[in-house]
């Protein structure tokens, strides 16, 4: 059984130490690309592992009705401040994605920039259960994950395409999987990743 309090403490410590290389402070270019290419219209949306809220705020600015969840209270405090400055409304949820009991209807669009590739190491089955709870037939799920095709000393956990298809294929049909690069702070090109757009069966 996963110790959810220790997971939250780990991520709070990372934010307290400002050891957050994934937090570029820039809205995800790949998220923008996918929205533009697919024509996903504003709808009820959720970001899993939202961190300091950059992408959740961007979605709200595009007209989405956004909820965003993270286990780090420190990250959420920053996210709330940024949303207030941006003048947008986001429902910020403090909980672990591995044991969250969503209170309302399923979401039509779910965005995940790096949550899946971390959560699967702790408790894949619990993560898939959460995905099942928060989506319904036709819901779209965009997961940006690390890519095992690139060997790096530092960077996100790497996955092979076959792992993604096997694990997420229990619930979703694959609309597209392609390689892309994360953005590091300062606009520097970051690690190689997978951009995975899936549709709930």
Which ranges hold each PLM region?
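Short catalytic micro-motifs in class I SAM-dependent methyltransferases
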Residues: 114-118
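A short acidic, Gly/Pro-enriched loop at the edge of an enzyme's catalytic core
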Residues: 102-110
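Class I (Rossmann-like) S-adenosyl-L-methionine-dependent methyltransferase catalytic domain
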Residues: 2-46, 52-102, 119-134, 139-201
């Amino acid at each position: 059984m996963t110790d959810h309090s220790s997971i939250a403490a780990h991520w709070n410590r990372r934010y307290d130490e400002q050891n957050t290389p994934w937090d570029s402070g820039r809205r995800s270019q790949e998220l923008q690309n996918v929205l533009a290419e697919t024509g996903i219209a504003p709808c009820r949306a959720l970001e899993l592992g939202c961190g300091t809220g950059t992408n959740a705020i961007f979605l709200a600015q595009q007209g989405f009705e956004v909820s965003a969840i993270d286990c780090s209270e420190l990250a959420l405090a920053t996210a709330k401040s940024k949303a207030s400055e941006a003048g947008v409304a986001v429902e910020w949820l403090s909980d672990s994605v591995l044991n969250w009991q969503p209170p309302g209807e399923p979401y039509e669009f779910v965005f995940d920039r790096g949550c899946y590739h971390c959560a699967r190491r702790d408790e894949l089955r619990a993560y898939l259960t959460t995905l099942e709870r928060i989506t319904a037939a036709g819901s779209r799920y965009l997961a940006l994950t690390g890519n095992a095709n690139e060997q790096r000393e530092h960077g996100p956990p790497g996955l092979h395409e076959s792992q993604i298809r096997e694990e997420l294929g229990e619930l979703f049909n694959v609309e597209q999987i392609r390689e892309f690069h994360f953005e590091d702070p300062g606009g520097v090109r970051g690690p190689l990743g997978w951009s995975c757009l899936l549709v709930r069966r």
